[in-house]
Amino acid sequence: MTTSEIATVLAWHDALNEQDFDTLVSLSSDDVEVGDAKGAAQGHTALLEWARSSGVKAEPGRMYVRDGIVVVEEAVTSAAGNSTAASAFRVVHDHVTSVFRHPDLASALAATELTEKDLAG
């Protein structure tokens, strides 16, 4: 586990929640991949389209980290109400190279093969 991977993901959440799109882009690789069960898109343009249209705030909770993969349990607030979800990030050289939304923590952990042993903190 490295502190920089966690710090990158926390800063990414802050930028998303504050709609600070310049910082969101600066924390993401040029070819960042953004996806969920419906599909994926790549690049800063796709990231910005998703961030501007999502209308969500995602407050990070428990974090799991191993080999550049960070899974974050999230408390999500949107126009539809409050829920929980999880996102799986790949972080390389302090940049998010991919982020995939999952409906729950269990599916994010299964997709990344992380376990309770990888719980940060």
Give a label for each model feature.
Residues 1-121:
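C-terminal and inter-domain tail/linker signature
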